[in-house]
Amino acid sequence: MVVVSATMYFPQQARAIMQQVPVEYQPQSEWDTMRQRHKLGDDQIVALWEWQRGMKDSHDDMSFTPPSLARITASTLIIYGDRDFLYPIEMAIEMYRAIPHSALWVVPNGGHGPIFRDAVPQFVKIALDFFSK
């Protein structure tokens, strides 16, 4: 298993952040990345972010706590950017400590969703190494 997002681990915090971060406050690097991926322009990007903000109410049944994370039996790779502007790194560390047979990869200079940007080659290598064990 690869844990890419921790929003379900802290649903209240995730909802609050999704509601508070207006599109215009997204970092320029995020806009640049989105513009490379979504060729229909800024209207498409804004619509995607608004759709994501709409997910804020969809995590009620997925509040993972350390005791529930401890029941995960699959080997789990947790990936986290050390410069995530939305969630503190302590979240990833707590998940790593709670999930048996887990590994934590902290992406240097990685923001929110670091494997979708410059870290793709490293992600592929680390994930393949992880799954080969």
Regions found by a protein language model. Give the residues of each.
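Short aromatic-enriched loop/helix-cap "lid" or pocket-rim segments at secondary-structure transitions
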Residues: 13-17, 91, 117-120
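Acidic catalytic loop of the alpha/beta-hydrolase fold
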Residues: 83-87, 113-114
